[in-house]
């Protein structure tokens, strides 16, 4: 009976060790769950970014307005007959917090 008790205690100690410190332990499980949450957040951001890019591609394919806007903003191009004005100066007037 004494040997059986010793064997059972040793088995319990071995199982507890594996639970807390071994492969697939609770600590590793919590760490993996945290990594999954971070990856899901990253995936959600990338899905939103992809949707924006898809919409932009669709706009560029379907009409000239988006293409013209992009040419104006990124390349500084102007239409024939338009006058380009560049405002040079410091920061815009900001309301004071007083």
Swiss-Prot record:
Keyword Cell cycle among UniProt keywords:
yes
InterPro entries membership? Cell_div_FtsB, FtsL/DivIC
Presence of the UniProt keyword Cytoplasm in the record: no
Q: Which GO terms describe its cellular component?
A: cell division site; cell septum; plasma membrane
Coiled-coil spans are 31-74
The GO biological-process annotations, alphabetized, read as:
FtsZ-dependent cytokinesis
Residues in the Cytoplasmic compartment per record: 1-3
Q: Which residues lie on this side of the membrane: Periplasmic?
A: 22-98
Keywords, sorted A to Z:
Cell cycle, Cell division, Cell inner membrane, Cell membrane, Coiled coil, Membrane, Transmembrane, Transmembrane helix
**Transmembrane annotation, as ranges:** 4-21
Compartment annotation: Cell inner membrane
Topology in membrane: Single-pass type II membrane protein
Indicate the principal place this protein occupies in or around the cell. membrane
The family this protein is said to belong to: Belongs to the FtsB family.
Assembly notes: Part of a complex composed of FtsB, FtsL and FtsQ.
Q: Which PANTHER family match?
A: CELL DIVISION PROTEIN FTSB
Q: What does this protein do?
A: Essential cell division protein. May link together the upstream cell division proteins, which are predominantly cytoplasmic, with the downstream cell division proteins, which are predominantly periplasmic.
User: What is this protein's name?
Assistant: Cell division protein FtsB
**What species is this protein from?**
Shewanella halifaxensis (strain HAW-EB4)
